[in-house]
Curated annotation (Swiss-Prot):
Protein name (database record): UPF0250 protein PP_4802
Lineage: Bacteria, Pseudomonadati, Pseudomonadota, Gammaproteobacteria, Pseudomonadales
Homology family: Belongs to the UPF0250 family.
Xref: Gene3D superfamilies: 3.30.70.260
Signal peptide: none
Disulfide topology: none
Length: 91
């Protein structure tokens, strides 16, 4: 029996249009904090910025695209966002 042809979904770096979704507590300045942290680590495309609140308003989601240079860079971004204490998830 042959194995199915499964294609790997690896990221090829640099990736000029890498989507980032950041979910965190709804607090004043959340969007600006996300942009500030991302801007320290990558070129941010603000034209792709989208912000949404959960139905009850407890959480906010900020989505945008960055230029991703490496896996290490993505790890650093994740760590920096999580270190804020208000970010719950980075996708």
């Amino acid at each position: 029996m042959s194995e199915p042809d499964v294609k790997s979904h690896k990221i090829e770096f640099p990736c000029d249009d890498y989507p980032i979704k950041v979910i965190g507590d709804t607090v004043v300045g959340f969007k600006d904090m996300v942009i500030e942290v991302l801007s320290k680590h990558a070129k941010v495309d603000l034209s792709t910025l989208a912000e949404r609140q959960s139905k009850e308003g407890k959480y906010t989601t900020v989505q945008l695209h960055i230029v991703a240079e490496s896996e290490n860079q993505l790890h650093d971004i994740n760590s920096a966002l999580r270190a804020t204490g208000i970010v719950k998830m980075v996708l």
